Amino acid sequence: MTSIIDPKKYTKTVDLLRSFFLSKGFFEVHTQNRLSILAACEDPETVATYEYNGEIWPLPQTGQMWLEYELLKNPEAPGFFCVSTSYRQEPNPVEGRHEVIFPMFEFEMHGGVDELKKMEVELCEHLGLPELEIDTYDGWGNMFNAKELEHEHEEKIGYGMITDFPEFTSPFWNMSRNDDGATSRKIDVILNGMETIGSAERSTDKEKMRETFHTISDGEYANLLYKLFGKERVEKELEEFLEFDFFPRSGGGIGMQRLMQALS
């Protein structure tokens, strides 16, 4: 189910990432001791739960919400990052591509999708990776004569960047949408033929975030959270998040094992 991670490769990789973000003045956050319902991703089929101190919680899939929390509470900081563990109860894992428990390196920063793209290109240069070919989701789709990009297309991309994801790909509820209303300001970085960095500009539109929370994955995401944790708890946590004063910001998560493969 899960692979044993080589400590030497892991140390080298996490040190490269830490040094990059620390050089930009980012602060490291410990997120694993923080309980949150909204720490689940957009695919409701992969959420697993545990009971702690008399309440049911989702096994965390991301530290993103806590990094956003820190940036929104401390806007004077350049950014934040964390090393987290993601639990993905994949119903049909693809061997060699999917780990059901894996380490992630996540970051949150000021600026929109243009600043995010620039930073990720700089990060890949810092890591010594090949130059990235950049195109939109539809652009890559036209290249491969495919409406929906699959694993096989990522393998053909090799090293590249996919931008402007259509709504049918179920972008996360707090991702910023483009003015066309049909695509999101989301970027996936493909390294060694696999999606390794998933990132996006965050929304500043409270009403749009509230609406999208209830409609992503055809409403299954919100309904599953209600079923597992109760509507009152879920809505309370959502509304507490939406009380923040939002500003342009972006962030993403890096799959450590996939990055280690790309670097080896």
Predicted ranges, named:
Residues 45-114, 118-119, 129-264:
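A translation/RNA-centric and nucleic-acid-associated enzymatic feature enriched
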Residues 14-18, 30, 63, 84, ...:
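Short, well-ordered alpha-helical packing segments
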Residues 1-46:
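TRNA-binding/sensing appendages of the translation machinery
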